[in-house]
Amino acid sequence: MENLKQILADALSAVAASESESALDDVRVHYLGKKGALTALLKQLGNVSAEDRPKFGQMVNEAKDQVQEKITERKASLAKAALDAKLATETIDISLSGKGQEVGGLHPVTRTMERIETFFRGIGFDVASGPEIEDDYHNFEALNIPAHHPARAMQDTFYFNPSTVLRTHTSPVQVRTMETTQPPIRIICPGRVYRCDSDQTHTPMFHQVEGLLIDENISFADLKGILQQFLNVFFEDDLKVRFRPSYFPFTEPSIEVDIMRTNSKGEESWLEVLGCGMVHPKVLEMSGIDSEKYTGFAFGMGVERFAMLRYKVDDLRMFFENDLRFLKQFK
């Protein structure tokens, strides 16, 4: 018993005298380690009488706990002293200017999308949205593209199963609106669309804005006037615009729209920017709209394409690489 008291006193004295964590670790190993002084006492329990053995074992364990507690307290005390000393030698000049946080900016695709939406909202169009995972009916059949129609080959589609796809355009939003809303209808449908394509001018996911206007006595002249005005406002220029015949299953007649662009050498050329046309009567009828009473037009454009033209970006993939050197230019 006396030996235990002496060892405990020596251990506590050694802890109190330690001036560093490494010194405390040495004390811990010397008294509490596998070959430590207090641990050795437990190995001598066999030499203690059976009557005194439980009490002696308890006293040794309590001594070990006491030493460990003092080591922990001493470590905390040393850490606090070190921090106080560090703070005492460091000063902060509160008169110095703070480091301002760099302000982020909108992505160029977002900027372009908002620019398009702002124009069409300004002339009375509402913004409509719909699911990106679509059924075959709304993505194809309701748009006059039945199964095995040659036009399906125009679009490389991501299929979940034979009747469920990632939408290849935002036209299904127009169909769903026509199914639930009676004319007059005046909407644009911005959103992500998906096609199996990837190169300098195509990505598997990109953004479209499609528009739809249905009312009585709507003509191609209305479509032409709105698109001419939109292109002039978007590009901030009085553009030369060309409307030429094309083919889309959901419009008749179908038109592709080109604008005249001038390159760095001063050479002019036509560049396709969007597709449009008068809504096919069959599409109106399939959505429950009387094609004898109502007519309408639809148009669609790729947002990234407009962003590339506006910001003079040559490679579409740069919009999706998250390179801050590129994105910081649009702040």
From Swiss-Prot:
GO biological process: phenylalanyl-tRNA aminoacylation
Major subcellular location class: cytoplasm
Keyword Phosphoprotein: no
The record's free-text note on cofactor binding: Binds 2 magnesium ions per tetramer.
Subcellular location(s) per record: Cytoplasm
Cellular component, GO, one term: cytoplasm
Keyword set, alphabetical order: Aminoacyl-tRNA synthetase, ATP-binding, Cytoplasm, Ligase, Magnesium, Metal-binding, Nucleotide-binding, Protein biosynthesis
Molecular-function annotations in GO: ATP binding; magnesium ion binding; phenylalanine-tRNA ligase activity; tRNA binding
Quaternary context: Tetramer of two alpha and two beta subunits.
Record protein name field: Phenylalanine--tRNA ligase alpha subunit
